[in-house]
């Protein structure tokens, strides 16, 4: 598998932008919350507060697609990834995998699912055991899960090394003998060794040299295309996310503030925070019209005591009194493409306040409301 056989844009465009309406999500997250306790006092440690790292997150991931998760450092995206793989225990909420809630599953119940949900970590230097050979590292998941591929584990590991662009002769080498990009390829080989259905990639290229990043992204896209793996791709670089992901969710201070398909979000962002993030992405075309850079005032509030109402209001140029008293729901607004959800009382794009008539209601909720109105009309008659 060659790194340069395809560009990232070309590979990403191979995936359809529309899904069959009957397709069930592979992963469904509802109200996912993770609060880390803050301990204080001596000699008895007691909880004096909580860091609200993730605070009520909702999204879905469909088979074979890539969902990008973006936001500033500290927004909760990496914590979300570790919750999905159950490296962290959720405080509240549900994580449904293939329709089964795994948010409270114990180790025995998670055992058959572990092989189907894998993770690629950010730091290729810290995520590989320096005392193990490449062969031992990649075959580790097979040994843990009792899997013996045809021809044996060594043969399969050598095949995986070729798939990720390394030589089968690297089987007996140690991690310190490889560059950062090569180490991340080893991490990719380990993640796909069990042929999972879902991979959570936590900033897989941010620690790599810029010249290597595109090669690793190309590799991940080719793996996704050939093996049909769904990805949750966590990153802060919106340009890379645009190339890799078919849908993108934007997080701010533990909340998803906007989620949409790639083209809809990048071409018509509705949340002010998304608009500000995109304004900072460098333009590749020097002849293109320069978009105005939006500079956010102030610092990100503390996740220990986040603002009331809309969490972005303390830095938002459109904030009004309503933003401090009412938390905006994540809904589809009129004029948005299907599935483009925004949590804002006063969305961008020149629109006015998101009134009730502007909100495109979920069909199921709309039917329930119509039935209720019909029943009221009959009773009045």
Predicted regions and their residues:
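P-loop NTP-binding/switch modules centered on Walker-like glycine-rich loops
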Residues: 197-200, 204-208, 212-291
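ABC ATPase NBD coupling module
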Residues: 43-47, 102-118, 144, 150-151, ...
